[in-house]
Amino acid sequence: MTSKFRRAGSAVAIVAALGLALSACGGSGSGSDGEGGGDTSSITFIPKNLGNPYFDASDAGGKKAADEIGTTWKQVGPTESTPDSQVSFINTATQQRAGALVVSANDPKAIGDALDEARNAGTKVVTMDSDTEPQFRDVFVSQADAAGIAKSQVDLIAEQIGDKGEIAILSAAANATNQNEWIKLMEEELAANHPDIKLVDTVYGNDDDQTSFDKTAGLLQSHPNLKGIISPTTVGIAAAARYLSDSEYKGKVALTGLGTPNQMREYIKDGTVKSFALWDPEQLGYLAAYAADALASGDIEGKEGDTFKAGDLGEYTVGADGVIVLGEPTVFEESNIDDFDF
């Protein structure tokens, strides 16, 4: 089977990719033209929740881009990824006349009114990683093609369990736009191309380490014939790996998903996990900052075909529905995981 995720090949290719890694979604609605304007020297980043290593990496990328641009970047946000937990932070940024917001949405609709108010006040809105409904933002910076992510997750688990048996999904929040899209596409991919793999359960750890750990235990207790788990969330896959590594299921139940090399290195090396994947979240924040600045500066409007330069990442083009795609993720395994540090 083939995977849309790229596996690192030559040492030269790895070094080149690492260089980028260490350097670091439509169109505008009627609210975008509100009078009053914002401060184009300010970008406010609102992740799903604070204390999440994935978003810490995105924050670092955004700060790096802001330094290169000569603008300011700050991160604020909730401690829990509930549907409306970001609203107060959006409202505060609007009152402070931020030039742009970069938001990873916990819910596609719950923050819509707050984002409308921000855009009416002249603030540009970039969603990143997890989108809102398109009418609430100017552009969405997507980590990768959703269908490709879903297919690759299924391919990875199928490879590890011999393309047959029971699997489950450990997701983040039940309302997370990106997670739900991936899960829907994974279900379609399984039905179309993997008739001997049965998805028996989908559970939600809410991007909380302990909850995800407990949900992993619950899956294994509820489904004694489980052969594998897909966790398309960095918090979830790390918590599941921690549980498996000290349990009787180590080496018997496969685990894959989306994780960072630094979180997952020990579990690759001790044999708990064979392979997993991710794009570089630092690059994602880096690209989102450049997109936000291009909008706030008037260089782009968020229309299909608009182009802008994103520092070391090069030129990007806005696609249909205002989507900007970072690129294809990498598969991490024992042979290459030490070549990455994020």
Label for each model-derived stretch:
Residues 33, 111-148, 159, 166, ...:
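Flexible loop/hinge segments that line or gate small-molecule binding clefts
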Residues 44-46, 97-105, 124-128, 168-169, ...:
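Periplasmic-binding protein-like
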Residues 41-65, 69, 73-88, 104-108, ...:
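Extracytoplasmic "Venus flytrap"
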Residues 22-38:
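Bacterial lipoprotein signal-peptidase II cleavage site
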Residues 103-119, 186, 205-267:
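Hydrophobic alpha-helical
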Residues 86, 141-167, 209-213, 260-264, ...:
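Hydrophobic alpha-helical segments within soluble ligand-binding/sensing domains
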Residues 10, 14, 39, 174-178, ...:
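Hinge/cleft segment of the Venus flytrap/periplasmic-binding protein
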Residues 1-23:
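Sec-dependent bacterial lipoprotein signal peptides
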